[in-house]
C-alpha cells in the first residue's frame, strides 16, 4: 500500500527520496525533522523509564519545539537544532528570517527556550546523539543583550565555555538545580 505522500504527489517513495537528496535546502529541513524525531524518541524513553513526567511537541512557527515536564514539576522549553556543516562543531542559534524593520528579530530572545538540544548527526553519523546546553549559560549577542549569540562552539571538553551535556538527564538535573 503506498504511503499517503506517494498518493498525494503521484510519485513513488524512491522518487520522493531522490527529490530530497538532490535539493540542499530540502535536505537541511529534513535533517531538522530527523533531529526532532530522534529527540522525541529520547523523550518517550525518559517518560517510559519514569524520570520525566510528560512532554509535548510543538510544530508552530515562533514556538519552541518541545515542552518537557520534570518529575519535580519544572517546565522546560526545548529547541532542537543540528550542528552546522564544517570543520568546527558548533550550533547556529538564529531564525531563518528577520521581521521587517527589526533586524534583531532574527536572533533568539533569551526567554524563547530554556534548553537547546543539538543533534550531532552531521559530525558523527549518529543522528540519535545530542549535546544539551542551558540557555542561561550561553553567551549573549554583542549588540542585543536580551538575545542569544548566534554561533556557539560545542567543545569536547566540558570545561571550555558554557557547560554542554551529553546526557539529557544531566541537563535536566542542572536546569532544576
Language-model region placement:
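Active-site metal-binding core of divalent-cation-utilizing nuclease and nuclease-like domains
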Residues: 54-72
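Structural alpha-beta junctions
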Residues: 48-51, 140-142
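Non-catalytic C-terminal interaction segments of nucleic acid-processing enzymes
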Residues: 123, 128, 133-177
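Extracellular structured ligand-interaction cores
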Residues: 63, 75, 113
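Catalytic cores of nucleic-acid endonucleases
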Residues: 80-130
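Interdomain/boundary linker segments immediately adjacent to catalytic/signaling cores
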Residues: 1-47, 54
